[in-house]
């Protein structure tokens, strides 16, 4: 931290707080051990989340980053949606910005997107896990979407957030699959 401060970057740790709102996963992708290792989705209550956010604001944090193993699944077992958590965090006095960690694209509904778009404190950056541009590979991976469905969610996000940033991650097992994904992304 001293080296960061000497370069004028020391306050970076004061600006952001990472708020874990969800743990576990029920998706069972073929390559992933998380459902076995971490168990089913468990979401924190909105009251618990907002209490932590208020504490972080009192410590000087102005930007909250909502994180989870499968953030898009937030609330599924307690009758809530990710949009509920976003609205709750955005409503806390002193919060200037809210960011989201990686999202599963197929779990975002039009209602979720509309509710998110109404939150002016939400940064319009969405990291959507693509994994592969190949339908066959996605099916073998037990991902629950196709490249066309992924593209559709990108279009819906861009309609609601015209200047949004979309980032992704991919996995390439073979040269052929890497080529398919590269061609899809271009």
Summary of predicted features, one role per range:
Residues 15-47:
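Canonical Radical SAM [4Fe-4S] cluster-binding loop centered on the CxxxCxxC motif
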Residues 58-173:
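Conserved SAM/AdoMet-binding glycine-rich loop
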Residues 42-47, 106-110, 176-177:
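Active-site glycine- and acidic-residue-rich loops that bind
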Residues 4, 40-41, 77, 142:
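Pocket-edge positions in alpha/beta enzyme catalytic cores
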Residues 36-65:
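Conserved alpha-helical substructure of the radical SAM core
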Residues 2-13, 175, 180-186:
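Single conserved hydrophobic/aromatic residue that forms the stacking wall/gate
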Residues 10, 27, 39, 72, ...:
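Glycine-centered loop/turn positions within well-structured domains
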